[in-house]
Structures are given as structure tokens and as C-alpha cells.
């Protein structure tokens, strides 16, 4: 293992500049001169969130900011996820390792790890709902978010109580969506869409590893195990917990999948596996916030919910806030909004 992975561009180096209203007013005026109405609107959203919008900027925001669900006419594409939402957050070698393991194999190995850590949650069958068929607000907004993001959510468990109100829980082959019953009251539809969309971003194939290995330390164990099974490092050189995970990978990853893992392991170029795990986790957390912002279409709401229901182990609240502000005025979000059919004309 050789050089560290490239760090994702979370927030700009100076958090102060991200909070500076002058930055967004300059952008607003620049976009107005260009005639880019959606970009002007998004710059005005930032000024409004910072409490610095003038009368014209406030009028633009109140005219176009959705009060309920966005009237979307499209869904997120592969390019939206991998080129736009993921801009500056790519950790390709760690991603390739996780992709080579494969979704169901990753789930089975991860579930055994979660059971060893006693994180398995009892999910009674009577708490199960099918989002596509259920008429509850919780299930309907989950289904709406799932379709928009193109991330499957086949079932939902509504429990009497759940720490954090909602989250992905370790399932035997893939993560399971669960929430507290209390989430069904006191939240608007856009708020539920933000929370569901942020969670579903972690249910994508590679990112689902974080449901079972939720911290950089634990994810690094999985990466060590994958490198050992792939023949890039000696089994004797990895940590004891990683060896247990490697035993599971040997049982689950065979044939063509093993060949893909061996190729990914040989291409892994990180001297510090923990650093790669940290960068992957950071990137996933930032991308989740961006996806949720794109889904709900309301920056002020996104910032408030991010503060009220923080979701991150490798990023700090100030970083996630700065990233949401920066991403709002990015060309990537403009392209996503055009794909969804919600760009201001």
C-alpha cells in the first residue's frame, strides 16, 4: 500500500468565506447579468438563509421556494449521483473495493459484524410496512423519496421508539429502513423528504457498508479484510477483527466476484487504510446532505434539519453546513434541478 487517497472537497478552506453574504450577493449579481434565473434564485436562497436577502432577493425566494413537495418531472440519474452529487467527494479505490465485494455479500458479512457488536435491532413483523402500498405519510414520503433518488426502499419498520428517530438498520443481506412512530406527526412533507433522502443515500450499494461499519475505524477493518482476501496484503498483517471479517469474505466472495476483488485490491493505492476509510465516510456524509437538499428543494429547511438531526461521524456540523451552502450555488445542483424539471426559468 502506497500513497493516501485524495481528500474530498468538503467545505472550502475558509469556513468564514462560506458564511460571507458578500460572496452570494456577488454571485447573485453575476448570475443576473448572465440571465441564469435558477442560479440567481439559488444564490438568493443562500442570502435568505443567512438573513441577508434584500427585498428583490426575498421576493425571488418566496415566489419560487416550494411550500410542499417539489413538482418534479424526473429522477436522479447515474451521472447525477456519480458526477454531480459526488463532485469533490470521490474515493475511487475504496469504492472499487466495496463494489467488488458486492451488495448481498457485503450485507451478509456486515450483518455478522453487526451481530458481534450487538447492534442487531429486533424488528417485529407487525411493525413492517410496504412503502409502495401503505397509505401512511411516513411510508408515502419514503416511497416518493425512493423513486426520486432511484434508491430502492422495499420495506419500512415503524417502531414505538428508535434512537435518532430514523435510520438504516443492519439487515441480513441489506440495510433495513426503520423509524420512530413519533416521526409521523409534527413534520411537514418536505422535512420528511429531506430526512428520508439523506438516509437513503447511505443505502446505495457501496455506501451501505456504513450501515454495518458505521465509523472510519470499523470501515477500515473491512477494507483491510478486502485487501487481504484480494491478495494485496498478508493476512498476518491485518488486525484481529479484520481477520474475522476476512473469514466471512472468503466464504461469500467467489468466482468472478473474487477476481474483481483481486483486481481492485491490486489497484488500491492507499498507504493508510484508515485515511481511505475516513475519506470515504466523509464523502458519503456530504453527498447524503446534498442529495437530501436536491430532493426537498429548500435550503433553509435543510440547514435547520441538519442542525436538529445531525448525521455524521467523520464530518463536523460546521462542515456539513458549509457544504450545503456551497453546493446550493454550484453548477452541479443547477444541472440536477434541470434533470428533475424544477429549475427556475
Language model regions located:
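Hydrophobic or amphipathic, alpha-helical segments that drive membrane association/targeting
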Residues: 8, 17-174, 182-190, 205-206, ...
Amino acid at each position: 500500500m502506497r500513497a493516501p487517497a485524495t481528500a474530498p472537497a468538503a467545505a472550502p478552506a475558509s469556513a468564514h468565506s462560506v458564511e460571507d453574504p458578500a460572496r452570494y450577493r456577488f454571485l447573485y449579481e453575476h448570475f443576473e447579468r448572465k440571465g441564469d434565473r435558477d442560479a440567481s434564485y439559488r444564490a438568493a436562497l443562500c442570502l435568505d438563509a443567512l438573513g441577508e436577502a434584500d427585498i428583490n432577493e426575498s421576493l425571488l425566494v418566496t415566489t419560487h421556494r416550494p411550500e410542499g413537495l417539489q413538482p418534479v418531472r424526473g429522477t436522479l440519474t447515474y451521472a447525477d449521483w456519480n458526477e454531480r452529487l459526488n463532485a469533490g467527494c470521490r474515493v475511487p479505490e475504496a469504492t472499487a473495493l466495496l463494489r467488488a465485494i458486492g451488495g448481498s455479500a457485503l450485507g451478509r458479512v456486515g450483518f455478522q459484524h453487526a451481530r458481534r457488536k450487538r447492534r442487531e435491532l429486533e424488528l417485529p413483523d407487525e411493525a413492517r410496512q410496504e412503502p409502495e402500498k401503505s397509505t401512511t405519510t411516513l411510508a408515502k414520503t419514503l416511497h416518493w423519496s425512493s423513486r426520486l433518488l432511484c434508491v430502492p426502499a422495499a420495506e419500512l419498520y415503524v417502531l414505538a421508539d428508535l434512537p435518532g428517530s430514523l435510520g438504516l438498520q443492519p439487515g441480513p443481506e441489506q440495510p433495513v429502513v426503520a423509524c420512530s412512530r413519533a416521526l409521523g406527526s409534527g413534520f411537514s412533507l418536505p422535512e420528511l423528504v429531506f430526512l428520508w433522502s439523506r438516509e437513503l443515500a447511505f443505502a446505495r450499494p457501496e455506501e451501505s457498508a456504513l450501515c454495518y461499519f458505521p465509523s472510519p475505524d470499523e470501515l477500515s477493518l473491512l477494507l483491510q479484510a478486502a485487501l487481504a482476501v484480494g491478495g494485496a496484503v498478508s493476512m498476518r498483517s491485518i488486525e484481529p477483527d479484520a481477520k474475522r471479517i476476512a473469514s466471512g469474505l472468503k466464504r461469500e466472495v467467489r468466482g468472478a466476484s473474487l477476481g474483481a476483488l483481486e483486481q481492485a485490491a491490486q489497484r488500491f493505492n492507499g498507504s493508510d487504510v484508515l485515511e481511505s476509510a475516513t475519506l470515504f465516510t466523509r464523502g458519503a456524509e456530504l453527498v447524503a446532505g446534498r442529495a437530501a437538499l436536491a430532493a426537498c428543494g429548500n435550503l433553509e429547511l435543510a440547514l435547520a434539519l441538519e442542525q436538529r438531526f445531525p448525521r455524521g461521524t467523520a464530518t463536523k456540523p460546521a462542515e456539513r453546513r458549509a457544504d450545503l451552502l456551497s453546493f446550493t450555488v454550484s453548477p452541479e445542483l443547477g444541472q440536477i434541478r434541470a434533470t428533475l424539471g424544477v429549475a427556475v426559468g
